[in-house]
């Protein structure tokens, strides 16, 4: 979330919101947040998490991006947690709605990483890539090992 450099006045989108963890975190900081999610089960989890954390400034927009984003207020900051292979269309819509929007895309696949950088640069943004790695400890006999988990890439974009 730090990568988005959000301010209290910002309107935020969380596209491909999943369970809404990013949306809730943004909402708890006082931002107006629109969680966009297409899967019914995930939408139900977002509703439950919104109630659990009293994040009433979190609005759920059920549907597929980018179409589901058309009627939302123009964003200042956008987190893309899932794109359904429509990243170019989603990012193009974001920039059309607000050419100064700050964007962060999460990726676990190298193809998504490459596409995010290409799309952001093609839209006149500077792309910055951060890799996040986590290792979990495991005891094997008298040894303690750290087993690496799959890395996550965060691609942030700011207008040049």
Model-found features: residue ranges?
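Conserved alpha-helix/loop element of class I SAM-dependent methyltransferases that forms part
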Residues: 1-8
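Conserved class I S-adenosyl-L-methionine
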Residues: 9-18
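Conserved SAM-binding loop of SAM-dependent methyltransferases across substrates and taxa
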Residues: 19-31
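Conserved S-adenosyl-L-methionine
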Residues: 28-33, 97-99
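S-adenosyl-L-methionine
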Residues: 36-77
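Short beta->alpha hinge that forms the Motif I/post-I loop of the SAM-binding pocket
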Residues: 37-42, 82-83, 108
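C-terminal substrate-binding/active-site "lid" region of AdoMet-derived donor-dependent transferases
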Residues: 91-148
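Core SAM-dependent methyltransferase catalytic element
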Residues: 142-160
């Amino acid at each position: 979330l730090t990568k988005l450099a959000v301010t209290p006045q910002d309107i935020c989108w969380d596209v491909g919101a999943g369970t809404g963890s990013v949306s809730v975190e943004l909402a708890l900081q006082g931002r107006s947040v629109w969680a966009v999610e297409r899967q019914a089960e995930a939408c139900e989890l977002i509703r439950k998490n919104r109630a659990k954390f009293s994040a009433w400034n979190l609005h759920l927009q059920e549907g597929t991006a980018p179409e589901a984003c058309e009627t939302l207020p123009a964003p200042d900051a956008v987190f893309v947690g899932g794109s359904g292979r429509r990243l170019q269309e989603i990012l193009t819509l974001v920039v059309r709605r607000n050419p100064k929007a700050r964007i962060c895309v999460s990726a676990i696949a190298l193809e998504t990483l490459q596409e995010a950088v290409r799309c952001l640069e093609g839209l006149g943004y500077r792309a910055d890539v951060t890799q996040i790695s986590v290792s979990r400890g495991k005891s094997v006999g008298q040894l303690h090992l750290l087993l690496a988990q799959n890395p996550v890439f965060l691609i942030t974009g700011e207008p040049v």
